Regions:
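S-adenosylmethionine
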Residues: 82, 91-95, 99-214
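Aromatic pocket-lining residues of Rossmann-like dinucleotide-binding sites
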Residues: 85
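Class I SAM-dependent methyltransferase "Motif I" SAM/SAH-binding loop
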Residues: 75-79
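Class I SAM-dependent transferase core
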Residues: 1-72, 102-119
Length: 214
């Protein structure tokens, strides 16, 4: 089966713009496969596994982002989760932050070829860009453990902003390990969503970081 076939089967039934998301997300995956030998963007090339781990995983918690005006995807890599989420939520502006120049150029080509009007690519370190710009939500997926992620993204918590970390099934120890960092900065980490992936390919947890109101 093709990427498009797999996505039409696997995407959540209640996903907004489901058919369009399936078509454009499949094209995104095709572009990754084309560029993979040159850029080493992913080790997952099986259509079904890629559809699940790269797209279904990214879009399942889409409701967490629907009221945001601007979202930053920190360390976007080949475009996950920012590009799949941008397909589901065309009214939300997404900024893909990727400091590796060759990956940023790849992302720019994807945005251009998929005609993603609500997406921009910035070839800059996430922490540097976030120090100068305000967004509603920062996404971190497979970037750093919470112990490093807390100090890295804490400066972005301005004006009610939130950091959402895509994590694996058990984050209890990771949250506890990061407690000294959150306590001294008056921040809070909490689990706000859990979900399983199709074909028993794992469970996911979304951890939210916010500033404690005084």
């Amino acid at each position: 089966m093709t990427f498009a076939d797999e996505l039409r089967e696997l995407l959540p039934a209640d996903l907004p713009l489901r058919d369009e998301v399936a078509a454009k997300a499949a094209r995104h995956l095709d572009l990754i496969v084309e560029a993979n030998q040159q850029f080493n963007l992913t080790r997952i090339v099986s259509p079904r596994e890629a559809a699940i781990k790269h797209v279904v995983d990214c879009v399942t918690p889409w409701r967490l982002f629907k009221n945001a005006d601007r979202v930053a995807d920190a360390g976007s890599g080949p475009g996950f989760p920012g590009i799949p989420l941008s397909l589901v939520l065309p009214e939300v502006r997404f900024t893909l932050l990727e400091s590796t120049q060759k990956k940023a150029r790849f992302l720019e080509s994807v945005v251009r070829r998929l005609e993603l009007k609500n997406v921009e690519v910035v070839a800059e370190r996430a922490e540097d860009w976030l120090a100068k710009h305000r967004v509603a939500i920062v996404i971190s997926r497979a970037v750093a453990p919470l112990l490093r992620g807390v100090p890295l993204f804490a400066p972005a918590l301005r004006g009610g902003a939130r950091i959402l970390f895509y994590k694996g099934p058990d984050v209890t120890a990771e949250i506890a390990e990061a407690a000294p960092e959150t306590n001294k900065r008056q921040l809070r980490l909490r689990v706000i969503e859990r979900y399983g992936l199709p074909d028993d390919l794992g469970a996911r947890t979304i951890v939210e970081m916010t500033r404690v109101k005084s």
